[in-house]
Amino acid sequence: IYACYQDREGGIWIGTYFSGVSYLSPKHKDIEWYYPNGTENSLSGNVISQFCEDPDGNIWIATEDGGLNLFDPRTKKFKNHLLRSSNPNIGYHNIHALLYNEGKLWIGSFSRGLYILDTQTGKMKNYRHNRANPHSIPNDHIYSIYQTKDGSIYLGTLSGFCRYDPESDSFRTLEPLSHIFIYDMVEDQHGDMW
């Protein structure tokens, strides 16, 4: 098991390393399996790294070998979203982290930085590490994205973690963890980050 997520209806989504997705329905108590089968509406990857849910009940699925997938539980169909680099002909497949917040999907990639997808317009913005800019993300390897109770958004990277500043549309790297690999984060009941 590589990732696990409980949706708002109580269903359990299990992401595996090379075996796709298993879903345990809370209503039927049966297991559904999803894996790439080469058709247009199937899952695009086998290495499942993260899940998140949007307000419409759709499940966003990050894979390390097939990019970003949107699963519609009503139709049981997948839609693949390739992240684009500066060259629109090159898609990127290795995604590690997801967060849905106010109509925007935050996407943490391996080696290509942070993408923010406006789910209404389809527009995407890419944030990359820039050595000349201390307010850029600290590293292009994003492993986790976390939103605290107060609405702050943090990124865990290969070189520490940072907090997003929405007013300046920039990031503040948090010391003394600026050179530590941050794989995951959680906020405790006191508002402290671990």
Locate predicted features.
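Carboxylate-rich, polar loop motifs that coordinate divalent cations or form catalytic acidic clusters
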Residues: I1-W194
